Amino acid sequence: ERGTLDYRGLGGFLMHRFAARSLVLVLVPAALAPLAVGCGGGAAPPATATSAADVKGSIDAKLQSALAGAQRTEKERKRDAYRHPKETLEFFGLKDGMTVVEISPGEGWYTAVLAPVLRDHGKLVVAGGDPNGDPKSEGTKHAQALLDRFQKAPQAFDKVQSVVLKDSSWSLGAPESADMVLTFRNFHNWVEDGTTEKVLGAAFKVLKHGGVLGMTEHRANPGAPTDPKTVGDSGYMPEEAVVKIVEAAGFRLEAKSEVNANPKDTKDYPKGVWTLPPTYALGDTDHAKYESIGESDRMTLRFVKL
C-alpha cells in the first residue's frame, strides 16, 4: 500500500472543503498584512527584519500551544516524557512557513503536534496507507483511524494534505517542494519489507536542496545484525547502519541528538521492542519491570539533502 501520489481520503475531503480559505492565505500572507493597511492614508511604516529570537519564540509558542491542544489525547500526552516532541522538532529545525512531509504517521501521534503548528503558515503532508485499501492491512487501519481523527477535529487538521503510498511507485509530492521530511520509528519496518531504497529515494526527490530529513528510530547495540528478519523481530537498528544507508541515498548527517536516549533499555526482550511500553507485548508478565525501563532507547538524527 505504498507509492503513487493520491489526494483521496483526507486531502480530497478537506482541501476541497477549505480551498477558498487556503487561497486567501496564499495570496495574502501575514507578513504582507502591514503593507495593506495605511494610517490616515499615509505610507505604511517600513518593515522591520524579524530577528532569530522572534522566529524561535514564535515556533516555541506554537509548539507549546499544540502540545496543550484539545486535538491530543491524554494517552498521547503521557508519552511526551519519552518522546520529547518539542525538543525533537526544535532539533530538526522546524520553522514557520515550512512545507513538511511526515512519512508513515500511524494514527497521528506526531501529526497532532505538527498540524496546528503549520496550519496557518506552512503545509503538512502525511504519507501513508490508503483508508480505502485492504481492510485487513495495518496500513489501512491506521489510515482509517487517522482520517476519522482529522474529521473530528477540523480546527487542527483541516489543512493537512494526504498522500497514499502504494507498491506501484513512490511519490511524496512535486520534486523539491518540501523543506523537511520527518519519520518516527519506521526505519526498521522499511528494512524488514525491503522498501528502504524507495522511501529514501522519494524523500530525496521531494526535498529542496539543503532540506532536512529528520528521523527517530529504536537503537540497537553497535554491530547488531541488520538482516530483515532480525530487524523485523527486534524492531531495533544500529545507528551506524542507519547513517550509512541514509548517506548512501545522497544525504549527509548534519547532527544527532540524545534527547530520546534511554540507557535503561537493554534491547534483549522476548518480544523485541514491543515488550516495552506502550505496547507491553507480554501483557501482565513482568509488567512492572518493563514499565520501570520505559520506552525504547532511540537515535535522533538530522540529515540534509546535498
Go through each PLM region and give its residues.
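C-terminal motif of bacterial Sec signal peptides marking the signal peptidase cleavage site
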Residues: P34-G38
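Bacterial signal peptide processing site
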Residues: G40-G42
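Class I SAM-dependent methyltransferase Rossmann-like catalytic core
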Residues: K62-F91, K95
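Conserved class I S-adenosyl-L-methionine
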Residues: G97-G106
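Conserved beta-strand signature within the Rossmann-like core of class I S-adenosyl-L-methionine
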Residues: V125-A127, G210-H218
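A short acidic, Gly/Pro-enriched loop at the edge of an enzyme's catalytic core
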Residues: F157, S171-V181
